[in-house]
């Protein structure tokens, strides 16, 4: 239960870029930062956290942690607005446990109103295995309701599960987040380039946005741009950071964006 106790919560923010090299939005993740812990420790915590979602659900902590993440993400977005940073949206990952809550849409709308934010500024990230495996009508209904509300719907870790084109349409997915296993060394591996190119072509045909996870080198970033990937997220852009460091990062990133490979346009 220490995961969600007041006073030890902080937001670690993982920037993403897109659209002519400009920052498209920031993804907000909740985590616990122990006294003396480093940002690397925090990033590792987040990684382990999402690998152990079933453990959290069994302990009854998943939904409470989700509430903490959502509140802090919207609070951060409100702070960026006040600082004049013009961050379009935040993305928050929702677990199957949260998506089974029949009151989710109303609860989320209340939180948005609390911060005077439009639904279009929140993106809901759903793991591919949730979409592929669920037969729960409440989950289907909730995701559809959030899409109607105006929230974006991202399919996370695409390529690691068994989501079909039918399930993508059924869940009103607007964008796929391509798993980092397809991105690592893509600038060096011709077969991987073909596979990633096929995924991007499929997404384009279906009218879906694309985001590549794990772009960590300039070569990977440049290849993603050449293949026409819409957005990219990874250590090549920035490491996860506490929310209080984001304003300086945004200012510095925009100052140097002219030398960053252009993401979202195919090479001519």
Region roles according to the model:
Residues 105-109:
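A short helix/loop element that forms part of the nucleotide-sugar donor recognition site in Leloir-type
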Residues 77-81, 112-113, 140-150, 197-204:
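Surface-exposed amphipathic alpha-helices with a cationic face
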Residues 68-94, 110-121, 149:
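Helix C-cap/alpha-to-beta connector motif
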Residues 1-6, 11, 59-75, 184, ...:
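Short intrinsically disordered, low-complexity coil segments enriched in acidic
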Residues 66, 70, 95-102, 121-135, ...:
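EAL-family c-di-GMP phosphodiesterase catalytic domain
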């Amino acid at each position: 239960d220490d995961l969600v106790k007041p006073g030890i919560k902080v937001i670690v923010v993982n920037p993403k870029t897109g659209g002519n090299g400009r920052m498209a939005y920031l993804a907000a993740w909740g985590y616990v930062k122990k006294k003396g812990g480093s940002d690397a420790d925090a990033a590792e915590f987040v990684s382990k956290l999402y690998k152990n979602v079933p453990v959290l659900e069994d302990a009854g902590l998943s939904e409470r942690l989700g509430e903490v993440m959502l509140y802090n993400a919207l609070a951060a977005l409100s702070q960026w607005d006040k600082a004049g940073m013009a961050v379009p949206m935040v993305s928050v990952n929702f677990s199957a446990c949260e998506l089974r809550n029949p009151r989710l849409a109303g609860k989320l709308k209340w939180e948005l109103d609390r911060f005077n934010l439009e639904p279009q500024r929140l993106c809901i990230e759903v793991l591919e295995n949730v979409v592929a495996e669920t037969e729960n009508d409440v989950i289907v209904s909730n995701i559809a309701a959030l899409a109607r509300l105006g929230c974006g719907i991202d399919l996370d870790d695409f390529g690691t599960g068994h989501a079909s084109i039918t399930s993508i349409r059924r869940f009103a997915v607007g964008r796929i987040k391509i798993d980092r296993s397809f991105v690592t060394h893509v600038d060096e591996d011709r077969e991987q380039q073909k596979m990633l190119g096929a995924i991007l072509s499929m997404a384009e045909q279906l009218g879906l946005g694309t985001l590549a996870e794990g772009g960590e080198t300039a070569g990977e970033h440049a290849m993603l741009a050449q293949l026409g990937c819409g957005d990219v997220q990874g250590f090549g852009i920035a490491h996860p950071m506490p929310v209080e460091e984001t304003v300086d990062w945004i200012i510095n990133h925009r100052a140097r964006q002219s030398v960053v490979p252009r993401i979202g346009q195919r090479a001519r």
